[in-house]
Design a protein with these regions (language model features):
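Conserved acidic donor-binding segment of nucleotide-sugar-dependent glycosyltransferases
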Residues: 219, 229-231, 235-242, 250-255
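Glycosyltransferase donor-sugar binding loop
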Residues: 115, 143-158
Length: 297
């Protein structure tokens, strides 16, 4: 964000005279800290893992924010080490509690679902396809649905379709495109699979847990491995297609285990209820504003 953008923001700051500013990304914080000398306190949010911002020059201004808010507790130390931030806390995203009618009465399909941006490097849906290929003969009545925007990376979409064709899995694996009813789509599935190498705070994964669908992801995946607790609300696979396939198989062949992990996932997500998260934010805002009030003689 450059000086021109700062000029766009300036009238609003001068007009409203805010008690505090929340920058939703480091670029915004850079603009405000660099071009506004007489400013209210600023809180900078990071909506991904701190390492994801390493190539952004604007992160040099993070240390000038009054507080940096990250999504998970383990990110607090990371942001301190990477960017010299001294004041950092974690506040997660809010996850809406879903009505029991969405998941208690619905008939579960023998479906493994992946809802994520379709990306070779960031989400690696091809690993799910390769893992399922190891299982399809043993579980011919199971299917895989890959949901995500198909317009962003047409080359990778073509690669996935070619892989499905080569493996002879057209009848069992479907690339579905986008949906505006994520929770409802996930709720009818039996397993949520996310083969990402890293995450910030994966919302679709949380929505899966919130409707009682157990998750399979990689143990090494930051973000996901904080939310998924092995053999409690999902399974954590080691870094190989074979291990991912084994975790899928463990759930595919054990409906009672799927139900047990699903129930725990619903309970776990209650900690992220909106009212709890907004209360945390309200407390943080009050504290930061109070710390910057002029001291009375």
């Amino acid at each position: 964000m450059d000086q021109a953008r700062a000029c766009q923001i300036s009238p609003a700051i001068l007009k409203f005279r805010p008690d505090i500013i929340i920058a939703f990304q480091p670029e915004s914080a850079c603009c405000i800290t660099q071009y506004f000398m007489d400013r209210p306190p600023i809180i900078t949010m990071m909506h991904a893992s701190p390492a994801a911002f390493l190539k952004h020059p604007q992160t040099a201004f993070l240390a000038e924010s009054d507080l940096t808010v990250v999504l998970l507790p383990e990110y607090v130390e990371q942001v301190r080490q990477l960017y010299g931030v001294t004041h950092a806390i974690s506040i997660p995203n809010a996850i809406e509690e879903q009505p029991p009618s969405l998941y208690e009465s619905i008939k579960k399909e023998k479906t493994i679902i992946c809802v994520a941006r379709i990306s070779r490097s960031e989400k690696r849906q091809h690993l799910l396809i390769e893992a399922f290929a190891e299982l399809q003969s043993k579980f011919p009545d199971w299917k895989v649905e890959v949901w995500g925007d198909t317009s962003i990376d047409s080359d990778y979409i073509g690669e996935l379709k070619g892989l499905i064709h080569r493996l002879g899995l057209e009848r069992q694996i479907r690339i579905c495109g986008q949906t505006n009813t994520v929770s409802a789509v996930i709720a009818r599935a039996s397993i949520f699979a996310l083969p990402s190498p890293k995450e910030g705070f994966p919302l679709a994964l949380c929505e899966s847990l919130a409707v009682g669908v157990p998750v399979v992801c990689f143990r090494s995946c930051p973000g996901a491995n904080h939310l998924v607790r092995d053999h409690e609300n999902g399974l954590l696979a080691e870094d190989s297609v074979d291990s991912f396939a084994l975790s899928l198989e463990t759930l595919m062949q054990d409906e009672a285990l799927r139900q047990q992990l699903g129930r725990q996932g619903i309970e776990d997500m209650k900690a992220y209820a909106p009212e709890k998260i907004w209360n945390q934010w309200e407390s943080v805002l009050d504290n930061v504003i109070r710390q910057h009030e002029p001291h009375q003689p």
